[in-house]
Amino acid sequence: MNNIIDGKALANEILADLKLEIQELTSHTNASPKLAIVLVGDNPASIIYVRNKIKNAHKIGIYTVLINLSATIHTNDLISKINELNLDNEISGIIVQLPLPSSIDKNKILSAVSPSKDIDGFHPLNVGYLHSGISQGFIPCTALGCLAAIKKYEPNLTGKNVVIIGRSNIVGKPLSALLLKENCSVTICHSKTHNLRSITSKADIVVAAIGSPLKLTAEYFNPESIVIDVGINRISSNKIIGDVDFENVQSKVQYITPIPGGIGPMTIAFLLKNTVKAFKDSLYTLDT
């Protein structure tokens, strides 16, 4: 049944376009896009994610610098390091790999990244732009990836009933803002929602981002559902599964993203797209 949304293929299309765009941009300037990745500690999953980001960045001509810091670093010391990157004109974008150790104040760290280099879209100013409907700043990459995957198969979203399971600042909240802009009717559910199945089963589109392995079975959907699984649940060193019971759900819905190979590659593609945007913005700033 060919109803799988191939996030890897979609991401490769985006990356191919970005590579050409970078070649064009760098042919007219001595500068190149450069991404700084701040990794605190040695979380195995974070190391894998960072490695994938670096690999894809290099493929399309984005330079990277990895700042690997001890898990015992203090919040203020980490802010000082971020400020150095903010002031470095060669750095186009900055990401702080999450999660951070519990001893670090995450909100202070995310607010320390310059909004003009905040390619994750987590700075309060960028969050405010998105939820105010202002076309400025950066939007979280996973939310952008979800929207692009949906629109590939459902270009006109006006009037669609969308249920997002998850209310995080990374997926649920920013994606809801993007979908409202597309004239969808959006319902956000979460772990405390009652009668979840009765809500999701009526939806045109369901986005699962709750971090609960295989929680959503076929009964949660209808035959016309588009299912976007954002869950990444690591059950061993080399195996991840989603929030949706893919094997039993695939044949019961219209379209579905797999895990892996779904939203993960799309997230990286849009992270790099945001990096190129930051690079272009910096070139414009230098010219004015």
UniProtKB/Swiss-Prot annotation:
Molecular functions (GO terms): methenyltetrahydrofolate cyclohydrolase activity; methylenetetrahydrofolate dehydrogenase (NADP+) activity
Transmembrane segments: none
Keywords: Amino-acid biosynthesis, Histidine biosynthesis, Hydrolase, Methionine biosynthesis, Multifunctional enzyme, NADP, One-carbon metabolism, Oxidoreductase, Purine biosynthesis
Domain of life of the source: Bacteria
Catalytic activity from the UniProt record: (6R)-5,10-methylene-5,6,7,8-tetrahydrofolate + NADP(+) = (6R)-5,10-methenyltetrahydrofolate + NADPH; (6R)-5,10-methenyltetrahydrofolate + H2O = (6R)-10-formyltetrahydrofolate + H(+)
Pathway(s): One-carbon metabolism; tetrahydrofolate interconversion
Pfam families given in the database record: THF_DHG_CYH, THF_DHG_CYH_C
GO CC annotations, alphabetized: cytosol
PROSITE patterns: THF_DHG_CYH_1, THF_DHG_CYH_2
Catalytic activity, EC: 1.5.1.5, 3.5.4.9
Residues that bind NADP(+): G166, R167, S168, S191, I232
Subunit and interaction comment: Homodimer.
NCBIfam families associated with the record: PRK14171.1
Purpose: Catalyzes the oxidation of 5,10-methylenetetrahydrofolate to 5,10-methenyltetrahydrofolate and then the hydrolysis of 5,10-methenyltetrahydrofolate to 10-formyltetrahydrofolate.
Protein name per its UniProtKB record: Bifunctional protein FolD
Native species: Rickettsia peacockii (strain Rustic)
Gene: folD
